[in-house]
Amino acid sequence: MKRIKLFTAALLLAAMSAGNDMWALSTSGKKDTHPVESPKFFSGNANPLSDFIFVADPTSMEYNGRLYVYGTNDTQQLDSVGKDGKNTYQYIHSLVMLSTDDMVNWTYHGLIDVKALSPWGIASWAPSIVSRIESDGKTHFYLYYSNSGAGVGVLTSTSPVGPWTDPLGRMLVSQFTQGLGHCKAPFDPGAVIDDEGIGWLSFGGGGKGEVGTDYMPGDARIVRLGKDLISLDSEIVEIKAPYHFEANELNYWNGTWIYTYNTDWNKRTEWPHEGVDKPSICCMSYMTSHTPLDTDSWKYVDNYFKNPGDYGMGFSNNHTHLQKYKGDYYLFYHNMCCLLYTSPSPRDI
């Protein structure tokens, strides 16, 4: 498999403002008070994507020639705790919707009020979206998200910007799901549909607990989804991901499943992979498989994106999404470049 080297544009530092109505909620995007068009920085690089709301944990998909990006609404936490509070993510109950047709000019489509749609939930972070054309001739969208660290929820729509509905009224995956094994935090979903139309879901985190090691925490998982994409259709299998932390993502290219994840902060004291460099601290690494439900088929390949702190920005967790759009590959990620010296440490895509 050809390896793709990823390059990202340098982020610009800029002042950002947040009014009292910064996160007025809307499931359709039509009632939100933010401007439809995002003002742009002088360079034209359009980084970060939004300059009026903090967004993290990106996912994206193309629909009718337009690229839609979804993320965690960090501004909701900032507005809840103030500039001297902490970003525990506990007050985040909504997801942000953006789109573009040129990767420079971005349109803001409002927020998905997950708390209103799924009142049983705890918090909503880190979405992952897939879509397909179904028997009614419509394109259906499936948006998986973290219900805090407790599990994975799912929302559906026939439009990329809603309105959204909760088809289950509960978590798709939880800490009590049968066959989960040692996975304290079955969150941070990464979904993909393969060439056969089969859906797959990766998730997991929470650390080694009593049975794992620093090198192999044993908390990364993958499962095949049912034909309805809102049920599970296989046993839950461990992906043996070295120094696994969170930020799970799945891609599928030419018969190969590609699993990416954020490594943890532990020292790399153990590393049995000859000829492959140890992953740096809290970086993004990836693994590949041709038979994803075979635990031993997953092979560690490389550390493909270091922590923003390694490039002179603030150290933080990371979360990436690789997207092919109009013939080019783009890597979405977040950092704390525009945190404005606030304690909550909000993030930007």
Describe the role of every protein-language-model region.
Residues 58-83, 109-112, 125-148, 153-155, ...:
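Hydrophobic core segments of beta-strands in well-ordered, beta-rich domains
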Residues 95-100, 154-158, 219-225, 283-291, ...:
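Beta-propeller blade signature
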Residues 9-17:
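Bacterial N-terminal signal peptides
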Residues 71-106:
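Beta-propeller domains
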Residues 55-56, 123-125, 185-188, 244-246, ...:
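Beta-rich catalytic cores
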Residues 341-349:
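Single conserved hydrophobic/aromatic residue that forms the stacking wall/gate
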Residues 88-93, 148-150, 211-218, 277-282:
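Short, solvent-exposed loop/turn segments at conserved positions within beta-propeller repeat blades
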Residues 34-51, 106-117, 159-182, 224-243, ...:
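Blade-edge beta-strand/turn elements of extracellular beta-propeller
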